[in-house]
Amino acid sequence: RSTEYIAILKKILNLLKNSKLEYLKASDESNLSKDKRHFNLQSTLRNRYFQDVTKLLRSLNVEVENLVIHRLNFEQMVISSIKKPNHTHLHKSIELDQNLLRLYDEALELNSAAFVLKTHREKIAESVSEGIYFLENAGFILES
């Protein structure tokens, strides 16, 4: 049970890192300063969540340094964005965040006392809603 929880937290870490990068790219891609600020804030939040989950893993005596340096997922992310050039970085951020929500749900099923995860989940869910609203207003259609 504990190893399953740790495995989920590691997946969350990886997605948070990728989500942070996509929000930075979305900021670069954007022309409006208010949108740039919003995307930079989301990136900063993902970085903070990353630090929180890292602390959580350390509290479970998991060595985190080795974990953080996985290039494989970043390369997979780059390859998948090449396959779908019509997807914006925000769209990719939303996809990553939706995957994060599923992982947070799994982690919370295994440890409902992890309040920091509940807080992250709520904020990310808000961000997904805002992102979808933003894309719909910009004329994008999201497949669910």
Enumerate the language-model features and the residues they cover.
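Carboxylate-rich helix-loop segments that flank metal/cofactor sites and access channels
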Residues: 55-88, 95, 99
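Short, highly charge-biased, low-complexity peptide segments
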Residues: 61-65, 115-116, 123
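Conserved alpha-helical segments that form or flank metal/cofactor-binding pockets of metalloenzymes
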Residues: 36-68, 131-143
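Alpha-helical bundle segments that constitute or directly flank the non-heme di-iron/ferroxidase center
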Residues: 1-30, 87-112, 126, 130
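Short, charged, amphipathic alpha-helical segments
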Residues: 36-45, 91, 117-123
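Membrane-interacting alpha-helical segments
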Residues: 1-6, 81-86, 138-144
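Inter-helical turn/loop segments and adjacent helix faces that build the functional surface
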Residues: 25-37, 106-119, 141-144
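Hydrophobic alpha-helical segments of small multi-pass membrane proteins
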Residues: 73, 123-124
